[in-house]
Amino acid sequence: AGMAGVSVATVSHVLNHRDNKVSPEVAARIRSIIKEVNYQPNTVAKALRSSKSSIIGVMTEDLSVWQTGSIVQGVTHYAQQNGYSVILSDLGLKDKIKTDYDSIYKYRGVISKELQRLQAVRVDGVIFIGMHDRDVKGLIETDIPLVYAYCTTENADDVQVGYDNREISKKITQMLLTCYGEEIAIIGGPIQSAPAGQRMAGVEEAYADAGISMNLKLRQNGNWEFESGQQACRDILK
């Protein structure tokens, strides 16, 4: 304000895009000085005044899991396009949980601590990205607006973003049957896994619609790990 020879209120009008309250010449001078000194607004202070921070918290079960990085990238790009910043909190649970995905509930304390950290910077909302597509009902309790991605919850009030395992699997199988015939090898996840069951149901529905019987010798189940998939391929190719 001092460098521009104007009041703090006038600078605030320009920073908050209320240019109709400032003459074009003054607004241009203020913007030039802002660029010259590389001024960065204090988002926390702004949040304290307005109760809105324009910051989204993204919490990942584990950033190293193959699909998570792409989801975070998509969230970040969309947030930036809409004037939001993103704070990432990676729980790093892959090596602790391994394939015992339901053991995530053992780490509710860790999740709660990270939520408190995000609350401290007054995020407007949190996106929780799972590392496995399964039900996490009751995992997180918070008053912050929360969206689940790549995991589900049976709570009717929870907001979640995902996809239809059964329908996608059905369409993929229909395409393969049309292009390559009926001898298709199927490698699925654990039999007790809900998403694996949904995907297999889609495969079976596609076969039924085509009036073709599945060759059960070409059907194997694994545990989501690369080594398991390799072994399933070997068993099918014997």
Language-model regions, residue ranges each:
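Aromatic/hydrophobic pocket-lining residues that form π-stacking "cages" and hydrophobic walls in ligand
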Residues: 30, 75, 203
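Short beta-strand elements in bilobed, periplasmic/extracellular small-molecule ligand-binding domains
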Residues: 79-106, 186, 204-230
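N-terminal helix-turn-helix DNA-binding module of bacterial transcription factors
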Residues: 1-53
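Alpha-helical recognition/docking segments in bacterial nutrient-uptake
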Residues: 51-174, 178
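Glycine- and acidic-residue-enriched helix-capping/strand-helix junction motifs
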Residues: 66-67, 191-199
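Periplasmic-binding protein-like
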Residues: 118-130, 185-188, 219, 236-238
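Hydrophobic alpha-helical segments within soluble ligand-binding/sensing domains
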Residues: 159-186, 201-208, 226-235
